[in-house]
C-alpha cells in the first residue's frame, strides 16, 4: 500500500516543539497507551499496547485513541502521532523514528486520524494523523545485532583495515 501526503500553500499551524501549555494537557488515554515522547517538531511518539490482531484488521484501540484525542487542546501543534511499542526508542533519534514509522506500518490499515472522513474517495482527518507502527504478529522479528559480528566489522573498519573510512 502507498500513502501520499500532499501539502501545499501557506503554513496552517505552528508546529509544537515541546509538550507544554495546552499541548501538555493530554486527555486520559485508553488503557495501554503511554508514555508520550517528542520525536521532532510537530511529531510525537506514543507507546501503545501490544498489537494482537490479524493482518488487515482495523484496531478498535486505535479508534478509541482517536476519539480520546478529539478533546486535546494541543492537537493542532502535533499533526503526526506515531504509536510504537517503544516510544523512547522511536523518539531518541530521527533515524529510529523514520525506521519504526515506515517499516512497521501499512497505510491501508495502520493510518488513523481524528474525525477521519472519506469524501469523493479522498481520505482526510483533523490533526493529529496517527500511524500504528507497533510490531505486528505477522511481521518478521526485529533484527538484533550479534556482538561478535559487530566486533569483526569494527575491526575491518579500523585504521589500516579494508573498510577504513567507509564505515
Describe each region flagged by the PLM.
Residues 1-167:
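Charged, compositionally biased interaction regions
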Amino acid at each position: 500500500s502507498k500513502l501520499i501526503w500532499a501539502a501545499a500553500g501557506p503554513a496552517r499551524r505552528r508546529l509544537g516543539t515541546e509538550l507544554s501549555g495546552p499541548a501538555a494537557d493530554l486527555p486520559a488515554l485508553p488503557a495501554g497507551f503511554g508514555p508520550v515522547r517528542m520525536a521532532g517538531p510537530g511529531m510525537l511518539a506514543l507507546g501503545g499496547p501490544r498489537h494482537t490482531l490479524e493482518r488487515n484488521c482495523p484496531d478498535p484501540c486505535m479508534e478509541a485513541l482517536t476519539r480520546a484525542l478529539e478533546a486535546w487542546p494541543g492537537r493542532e501543534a502535533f499533526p503526526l502521532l506515531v504509536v510504537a511499542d517503544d516510544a523512547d526508542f522511536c523518539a531518541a533519534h530521527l533515524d529510529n523514528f523514520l525506521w519504526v514509522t515506515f517499516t512497521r506500518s501499512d497505510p491501508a490499515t495502520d493510518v488513523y486520524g481524528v474525525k477521519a472522513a472519506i469524501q469523493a474517495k479522498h481520505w482526510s482527518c483533523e490533526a493529529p494523523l496517527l500511524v500504528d507502527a507497533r510490531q505486528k504478529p505477522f511481521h518478521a522479528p526485529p533484527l538484533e545485532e550479534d556482538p561478535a559480528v559487530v566486533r569483526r566489522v569494527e575491526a575491518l573498519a579500523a585504521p589500516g583495515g579494508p573498510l577504513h573510512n567507509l564505515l
